[in-house]
Amino acid sequence: MDQSNRYARLDLQEADLIAGGRHVLCAYVMKPKAGYGYLETAAHFAAESSTGTNVEVSTTDDFTRGVDALVYEIDPEKEIMKIAYPVELFDRNIIDGRAMLCSFLTLTIGNNQGMGDVEYAKMHDFYVPPCYLRLFDGPSMNIADMWRVLGRDVRNGGMVVGTIIKPKLGLRPKPFADACHEFWLGGDFIKNDEPQGNQTFAPLKETIRLVADAMKRAQDETGEAKLFSANITADDHYEMVARGEYILETFGENADHVAFLVDGYVTGPAAITTARRQFPRQFLHYHRAGHGAVTSPQSMRGYTAFVLSKMARLQGASGIHTGTMGYGKMEGEAADKIMAYMLTDEAAEGPFYRQDWLGLKATTPIISGGMNALRLPGFFDNLGHSNVIQTSGGGAFGHLDGGTAGAKSLRQSHEAWMAGVDLVTYAREHRELARAFESFPADADKFYPGWRDRLHRAA
């Protein structure tokens, strides 16, 4: 059934919809299946996403028609479809009237993902009007709070030098804590890898107790504050809270040095909101393991990594992994930097929409996946700044001289970039950085041709 006479209004102007402030706008790349018209399929998509179905129903009244989602722009050649969703469609909490991301997803990326007349449809951007934006929690903490703990400038404190303890599974509590101590002697921040939790060979309570002690010892030995991101991911709300409370109690006076990591993609919006509301004084570390199933450019359905990041800021993530923008081992490209800008800027341009965040606190980009000291300068050149959390697993513990030296090499790489000094030149007077060239020779050859002669040349 062609529903374009009801669910399509191509005379609507995007600027007018934004000025009206009553619609969430979504931009998709959509292709109908063979034999279906573009506008007809787009209208069915909007109907299925809001007030309609595949037939007219007798219970529809004038009010119902007033909250229809409307297709307002199409470009069949480029497969672009834009839909305006009235804000009244989205579910709100009965306890406080706040917005819920699960409702946003249910409507905009819900049943429409399985429609028989749609070959594929993927959301590439969305716009949130002020009246709806104000109903989301947004972050309570971000990198500025980490800088404060570290004793840095809270406006431009620079890269937080971090790692992921490797191997990701198989370490028992003491070796795990020993690895933490080793890295902290040179670095700032350690995160649990996403599967690390309460395995039988590494009970959480024993591991956390030893890690808290390792942090105290490292702080005493270096005179510097240290940070730890502890995984509290769980299916059950009460389990998450129990883990969080135990961790804070165990770290004691260093509780403000602790972030909580939640696997936000696999556990969903409920887990992120649980952590955000139950622990508002902790940095909420959004890990996105599994997201590539829908966000990868190879996937033609779902939504992009840009959309995931934007949703994370709405929900209140203090930081979210944003990949390495083509400079590490994970899928990505240099243009992905717009993802970081959308997280950090007061107003930013997306692929289709400009979003004004109305003072909502920024979310911190977390950079990980195949990074080491040799890859950092190019990454920072592309991004234009270094106010990120950077976590290198192999880039730290793959250093020939161990985790402490690996951490120092990462810090020295950042120092060189901040000073505008060529990395090979800087390495001549910084042993750990020099050894990073020897630790990762394939990267050294790729990014710094002739480094061997230059590194050992007399200054």
From Swiss-Prot:
PROSITE patterns: RUBISCO_LARGE
Cofactor, how bound (note): Binds 1 Mg(2+) ion per subunit.
Modified residues (N6-carboxylysine): K191
Amino-acid positions noted as binding Mg(2+) in the UniProt annotation, renumbered to this chain: K191, D193, E194
Keywords, sorted A to Z: Calvin cycle, Carbon dioxide fixation, Lyase, Magnesium, Metal-binding, Monooxygenase, Oxidoreductase, Photosynthesis
Binding site for substrate: N111, K168, R288, H321, S368
Purpose: RuBisCO catalyzes two reactions: the carboxylation of D-ribulose 1,5-bisphosphate, the primary event in carbon dioxide fixation, as well as the oxidative fragmentation of the pentose substrate. Both reactions occur simultaneously and in competition at the same active site.
Family assignment from sequence similarity: Belongs to the RuBisCO large chain family. Type II subfamily.
Protein name as annotated: Ribulose bisphosphate carboxylase
Organism: Cereibacter sphaeroides (strain ATCC 17023 / DSM 158 / JCM 6121 / CCUG 31486 / LMG 2827 / NBRC 12203 / NCIMB 8253 / ATH 2.4.1.) (Rhodobacter sphaeroides)
